[in-house]
Swiss-Prot record:
This is Large ribosomal subunit protein uL13. One of its GO terms (molecular function) is mRNA binding. Keywords: Ribonucleoprotein, Ribosomal protein. GO terms for cellular component: cytosolic large ribosomal subunit. Pfam families: Ribosomal_L13. Belongs to the universal ribosomal protein uL13 family. The keyword Manganese does not apply. Part of the 50S ribosomal subunit. This protein is one of the early assembly proteins of the 50S ribosomal subunit, although it is not seen to bind rRNA by itself. It is important during the early stages of 50S assembly.
Length: 154
């Protein structure tokens, strides 16, 4: 019996909606990365984009555990000498684009390269509860029920 190899034309992508309110960012990002890559499917093939389309709402209400909210730093370089910049997770979450915390967490869990970039285009993250993808009829995935560690205990 030969090994099954998924062909790009045979891929069936579903739309999944995840509400990030109260969920831990790292655990959420890990689950999203697996869904984007298609590793939850029996037809997973490493070189084919057979993951699902993922919509994340309420990204601004996702939580970080421990002291990551104040201590975690995101670095980037401008390209100029001495151009290293940093911003804390708190500054990003309280800033204009709080959804970037989840986007960066997922981006760093997906392989770097042409396939990883294509898979990241299947991720849509929104800070609020509104999204323009009602026509796709996404199925709701309740991440909090999958494992009680996925939510922050008070």
């Amino acid at each position: 019996m030969a090994t099954f190899v998924q062909k790009p034309a045979e891929v069936e992508k579903k739309w999944i909606l995840i509400d990030a309110e109260g969920l831990v960012v790292g655990r959420l990002a890990s689950l999203i990365a697996n869904r984007l890559r298609g590793k939850h499917k029996a037809t997973y093939t490493p070189h084919v984009d057979d993951g699902d389309n993922v919509i994340v709402i309420n990204a601004e209400k996702a939580v970080l555990t421990g002291k990551k909210y104040t201590d975690k730093k995101y670095y980037w370089h401008t390209g100029y000498p001495g151009g290293i910049k940093e911003r804390t997770a708190r500054q990003i979450i309280e800033g204009r684009f709080p959804e970037r915390v989840i986007e960066k967490a997922v981006e760093r869990m997906v392989p770097r390269g042409p396939l990883g970039r294509r898979q990241m285009k299947n991720l849509r993250v929104y800070a609020g509860s509104n999204h323009p993808h009602e026509a796709q009829q996404p199925t709701v995935l309740d991440v909090a029920k999958l494992n009680n560690k996925n939510t922050r205990s008070a």
